[in-house]
């Protein structure tokens, strides 16, 4: 792994003084950060219409597109130099129905490249391409401060709106009786290519997402589903074009539902008390493949389209992006706590076959710790789920320090997935507690909405309850606890040391997070602002909630050192948030903190050298204060 160039690192300070290396930091016996950072991640898998070829993204220093002939050897790299993209926001590459072209998004534009190889061609400023025949694409474009779907001719790439009438800027129902001011996403083209199903979120109700269908020729739109304050997502056409499957949270879980393409006959298909995603119909039409979430373990399942019966094809771990192959098998990506991301082929009754696993031997040979599912009680009696990793050798006679890790989002989760950075620190002797605080997904709608209107209050107390739980374990040294998070997890880490009169944590790490959610609301990109509005409403409606959720007002309470890190190109959480935090710490005085910025990085440290630099800084910081 090459060392990061100095010009890739902006500020690197300890209380305003240039940071200096430590000579006494030693790696653990079995793991190296270089190997963790070098572990490539195949993801965002799609399969061609004939079921023979897969396209996927593989993260390294870039997020390039690769092709894999199913059952025919090693994959081939199709693009070079595609910008690194965070997996949680990137879109899938798509193979044209005839197999000649691959479409993908990069640098704010849609591109196509010959599947046989060659230079890519930029079509238009757009994203999320989906093929409409072999010569057109449905893409997402930004118009009137909304995300709209458009049709793009590959030969003459000028986008025209998919939906015929202009959105209504008032946010009230428009012609012809259909709300038009909102965001269109998740395009799914009908088998005959005459219609596109999509998800629509109106601006006046950000909790609502409905399924709509647009006629490609006329632009006429009809609404198939929708309930105030609830979401329907992920439309998928049946092979005969008569039925659309989708996930809906109406029951309290994202169960699978079916509706006729004409809007009739809607019914709930599954009754599993679980979330289902990524549904795709079998070519025969009688069943679907999907991913079922089971307390943030993600099983690969099939669902009978008539009865709703769920059959487990392969348990998680974490399965994602499942697709049918030509011969009725399923290809999907898989990972778990001991297995980095790989592409697998699954046939009923057989062990999954690994098709592509770009894991370094240094990682394959290293010992992995699998987590234990635990729960603990928070301040109000709510049971909080978490994954607890116990390092080898931890015992009452050899008590270890521990790190509490709240995930980002907040509408997200920590699942049974590969976390090489956690494994590295486990090998050093740290315990690791990954907390799915209130507001996390995977535990039902009521749990997910527990933090609405309450950012930084109840969920912070969940993190404090995590520290209290760790103190009950006789193999954890309760005096040596740290908290580390990224994005929303960074925000909670900061709150955990501003709003805790017991001062449970000895140090905290804030990686590209908020310190003032009111100014962050003003600074953020459209998606971030809408996400905040969905959960916290407009600041003018409840300014006290924004104040209560902003740790910058209470930094005088901080009694422990902070490590603060931010990318200077971050649009989701502006780097001004960390600047504001540092300025206020300096104004108060007497606070210990370290501050590092990265000029080339956005929301996520994606380039290998800079990721390595940050985790070395993290190691140095945690070792100094906890080891």
List PLM regions with ranges.
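Beta-propeller blade-edge and WD-like acidic-aromatic loop motif
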Residues: 4-31, 53, 57-77, 100-101, ...
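Residue-level detector of conserved, well-ordered beta-strand and adjacent loop positions
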Residues: 37, 79-80, 124, 163-164, ...
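Active-site-proximal cap/loop segments of hydrolase catalytic domains
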Residues: 437-627
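Extracellular/periplasmic ectodomains of large secreted or surface enzymes and adhesion receptors
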Residues: 20-33, 165-168, 176, 326, ...
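Hydrophobic/aromatic beta-strand patches that form the interior of the parallel beta-sheet core
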Residues: 160, 374, 404, 433, ...
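Cap/lid segment of the alpha/beta-hydrolase catalytic domain
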Residues: 358, 362-479, 486, 520-530
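Conserved beta-propeller blade repeats
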Residues: 39-57, 82-105, 123-142, 166-202, ...
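Residue-level signal for short, function-critical loop segments
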Residues: 202, 408-409, 487, 568
């Amino acid at each position: 792994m090459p060392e990061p160039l100095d010009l890739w690192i902006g500020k690197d300070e300890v209380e305003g003084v240039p940071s200096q290396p430590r000579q006494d930091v030693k790696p653990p016996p079995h793991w190296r950060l270089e190997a963790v950072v070098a572990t490539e991640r195949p993801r965002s898998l799609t399969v061609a219409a004939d079921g023979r070829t897969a396209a996927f993204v593989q993260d390294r220093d870039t997020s390039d597109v690769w092709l894999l002939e199913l059952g025919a050897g090693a994959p081939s790299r199709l693009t070079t130099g595609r910008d690194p993209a965070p997996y949680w926001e990137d879109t899938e590459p798509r193979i044209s129905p005839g197999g000649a072209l691959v479409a993908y998004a990069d640098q704010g534009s849609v591109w196509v490249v010959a599947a046989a190889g060659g230079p890519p061609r930029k079509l238009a400023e757009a994203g999320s391409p989906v093929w409409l025949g072999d010569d057109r694409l449905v893409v997402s474009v930004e118009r009137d401060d909304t995300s709209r779907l458009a049709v793009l001719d590959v030969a003459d790439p000028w986008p025209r709106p998919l939906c015929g009438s202009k959105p209504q800027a008032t946010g009230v129902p428009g012609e012809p009786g259909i709300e038009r001011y909102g965001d269109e996403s998740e395009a799914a083209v009908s088998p005959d290519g005459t219609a596109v199903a999509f998800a629509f979120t109106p601006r006046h109700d950000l909790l609502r997402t409905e399924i709509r269908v647009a006629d490609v020729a006329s632009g006429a739109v009809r609404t198939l589903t929708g309930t105030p304050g609830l979401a329907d997502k992920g439309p998928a056409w049946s092979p005969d074009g008569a039925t659309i499957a989708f996930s809906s949270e109406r029951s309290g879980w994202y169960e699978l539902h079916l509706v006729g393409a004409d809007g009739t006959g809607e019914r709930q298909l599954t009754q599993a008390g679980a979330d289902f995603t990524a549904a795709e119909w079998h070519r025969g039409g009688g069943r679907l493949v999907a991913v079922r979430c089971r307390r943030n373990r993600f099983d690969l399942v099939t669902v009978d389209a008539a009865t709703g019966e769920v059959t487990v094809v392969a348990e998680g771990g974490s399965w994602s992006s499942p697709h049918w192959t030509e011969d009725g098998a399923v290809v999907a990506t898989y990972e778990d706590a001991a297995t980095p991301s790989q592409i697998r082929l699954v046939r009923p009754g057989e062990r999954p076959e690994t098709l592509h696993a770009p894991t370094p031997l240094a990682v394959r040979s290293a010992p992995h710790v699998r987590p234990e599912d635990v729960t603990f009680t928070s301040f109000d009696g709510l049971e909080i789920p978490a994954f607890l990793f116990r390092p080898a050798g931890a015992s009452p006679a050899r008590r270890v320090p521990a790190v509490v890790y709240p995930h980002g989002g907040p509408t997200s989760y920590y699942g049974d997935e590969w976390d090489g950075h956690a494994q590295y620190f486990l090998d050093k002797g740290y315990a690791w507690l990954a907390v799915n605080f209130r507001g996390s997904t995977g535990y039902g709608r009521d749990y997910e909405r527990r933090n609405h209107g309450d950012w930084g209050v109840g969920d912070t107390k969940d993190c404090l309850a995590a520290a209290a739980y760790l103190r009950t374990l006789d193999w954890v040294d309760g005096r040596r606890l740290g908290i580390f998070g990224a994005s929303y997890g960074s925000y909670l880490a900061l709150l955990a040391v501003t709003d805790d009169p017991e001062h449970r944590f000895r140090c905290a790490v804030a990686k590209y997070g908020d310190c003032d959610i009111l100014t962050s609301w003003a600074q953020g990109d459209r998606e971030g602002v809408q996400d905040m509005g969905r959960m916290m409403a407009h600041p003018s409606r409840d300014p006290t909630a924004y104040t209560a959720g902003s740790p910058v007002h209470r930094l005088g309470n901080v009694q422990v050192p902070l490590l603060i890190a931010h990318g200077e190109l971050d649009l989701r959480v502006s780097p001004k948030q960390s600047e504001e935090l540092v300025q206020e710490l300096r104004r108060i005085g007497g606070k210990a903190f370290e501050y590092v910025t990265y000029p080339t990085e956005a929301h996520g440290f994606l380039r290998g050298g800079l990721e390595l630099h940050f985790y070395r800084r993290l190691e140095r910081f945690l070792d100094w204060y906890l080891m």
